[in-house]
Amino acid sequence: MTLATRTVTLPGGLQATLVHQPQADRAAALARVAAGSHHEPSRFPGLAHLLEHLLFYGGERYQDDDRLMGWVQRQGGSVNATTLARHSAFFFEVAADALADGVARLQEMLQAPLLLREDIQREVAVIDAEYRLIQQHEPSRREAAVRHAASAPAAFRRFQVGSADALAGDLAALQAALGDFHRTHYVARRMQLWLQGPQSLEALGELAARFAAGLAAGEAPPPAPPLRLGEFTALQLAVSSQPALWRCPLIALSDNVTLLREFLLDEAPGSLMAGLRQRRLAGDVALNWLYQDRHLGWLALVFASDRPEEVDRQITHWLQALQQTTPEQQQHYYQLSRRRFQALSPLDQLRQRAFGFAPGAPPAGFADFCAALQVAPSVSLACQTVSPGEPVATQGFSLPLSRWRRRPESDPALAFAFYPQAAGDLVAKCPEKAAPLLHLPSPGDPPRLLLRPPFYCSPDQAEGLARGEQLRPLLAALRHAGGHGEWHLFDGSWQLTLQLPEPGRRPEAILQAILRQLALPVASLTPSPESIAIRHLMAQLPERLGTSGHQKGWLAALAGGSAEDAQWVARQLSLITAPVNPPMPAPAPCRRGVERLVYPGGDTALLVFIPLPDGASLAALRLLAQHCEPLFFQRLRVEQQIGYVVSCRYQRVADRDGLLMALQSPDRRAGELLRCGKDFLRQLAPMDEATFRPLQQRLAAQIRASRPPEARALSALRQEYGLPELTPQAVDALRVAEVADLAREMTRRRRRWQVLFTTGD
């Protein structure tokens, strides 16, 4: 479905894009400013990044946890910002009826920030901690290596992240520079706004007009200086793990980039990625923007590979093959890109519109685009496990960077095939028997099948990744047939979701191949190491909580579709040799204790999972977590400056519900972080009715909001097997005393906690 969209230029020059999304229960806003790291004064590298942080302190009207960050957290929404080379962006998503209140807060923080000295000092410390983190962040190091190949403008090689050394000196001068930067760039003619929600275009237009009111017009942004590459554009970066090839061309901005991305991400038989995997040349691929100005883009095609020469040659063959695709094939992939975009949340759609890969006009001139891409100025970076040479200092990093001297290779070109293709002789017989299937009928909606291992029995990460590798080409083939499938880790448990095409296009052969694949054994794959300590702990937590052994079988639920659809799916499920929807044995108790995990780097990370006590109210836990989240952030991140990762929230992990505290700090020990978490819970003031009622109302609205089909299917399975699941009735019946009792119980019984931590080098 194409969403009604309108772009308007408001008095003063602000451009607003309004997107009407009927029946949506969420809404989003994104403001983009034409100012980033390349615009900051050379005296204060990192100033644009620092200003991004400071703007969240807001202005005079909204104070403390009523500012955008804390307010969105209390709404159960999401909020963030980013500083790029030539842009900064601020964005949030909330329930649709809260959009206007969020836009009012966004308006004030961007138009009239306080920029107080004590806030500046506080955020300089945070920026410095982030700088120390990013020193060991492998993706950031690799991006910096590519940017080093640019000879102009000089900002590409300049330090941009910010640090205490760069920013903490003359506080008065820094405050003045921040004010000057804000007055120059945060003006109507250098700002764009995107709003998306179920509101009418007229109502969204009124919101945009209110946002623009009071903005100084300012001057239009100057054109970007020409981007020129240096003498050496084939580079090699010595790495300890995760070898890769980065192929990074400079291209004129075009809607064809999104179409190229769809061809690139395809994993069906005949695709580039299927061929590379078959020859063991590459594992994964990603397409990212390194840089964008008004007319030019710098793309990064990133392949996980230890054979960069062979992959680079196959990319060239692939670009040649793309020039021969037919208009019908290009239209097919264009429609796939639209389906990929429409599946995103409102906020992610706006992010793609502002600086990503939102589909634009239908394909035009794609062959010429691919031909131009093949000869475009480009940087190649081979990340290889070789002995590091002399380091190169660039952008605040010390990188073992050298010239890449390619080895000769002569692999034959892959045989590429593009879709749609004739069905051929692929015919499948429908089984006669039917397996048990839990069905949530909704004849007007397409059937969505959820398959997952029995509760508390999810495979570990290595086995789950291997299963995903087996399913990749089949799920891609399903996508070309009009369906969609995804094998992914959800709340610490692996699950498969399959959206099936309409009855006249049922791809029985593909579905049966997928189901048969589930019965085959898999060889474990070693997960890629996480680049941030707290993410490493999160990846390890599901296995640390324990499982109930390895019960064979699969749980299956179908959301949507008719009784006839359910009968057809149940017959297909009979092909699974393991039991479907088997009885569940009593779960093993949740593991507890304190464990240190080895992780390289200088930071300390702490993860505390406090499980919901047996028989306690899940509704009380959810409400308690909503209450704690902004208070925890305010106390430990803003007031105590513990570190840059500060989170306390409800989390389901490997089918167990609990309260999760996550902290990462460059200078605090694990014991100190744990003590901070304990003190927060011990000193949490008893909740009164005035605090309780708005939280209860918000939780009731969340549980009554429409949910994706796979979420409804999982909820039905949990209820079928007697696991805790949030219901509107439980939220309505909740009382403040239950929340207070639960808080005391979870705080007091600390021996039931599961604590994971890493310590710095």
UniProtKB/Swiss-Prot annotation:
Active site: 52
Residues the entry annotates as binding Zn(2+): 49, 53, 130
Enzyme class: hydrolase
GO molecular function, one term: metalloendopeptidase activity
InterPro entries per record: Metalloenz_LuxS/M16 (IPR011249), Pept_M16_N (IPR011765), Pept_M16_Zn_BS (IPR001431), Peptidase_M16 (IPR050626), PQQ_synth_PqqF (IPR011844), PqqF-like_C_4 (IPR054734), PqqF_N_2 (IPR054740)
Pathway note: Cofactor biosynthesis; pyrroloquinoline quinone biosynthesis
Family affiliation: Belongs to the peptidase M16 family.
Role: Required for coenzyme pyrroloquinoline quinone (PQQ) biosynthesis. It is thought that this protein is a protease that cleaves peptides bond in a small peptide (gene pqqA), providing the glutamate and tyrosine residues which are necessary for the synthesis of PQQ.
Protein name per the record: Coenzyme PQQ synthesis protein F
Species: Klebsiella pneumoniae
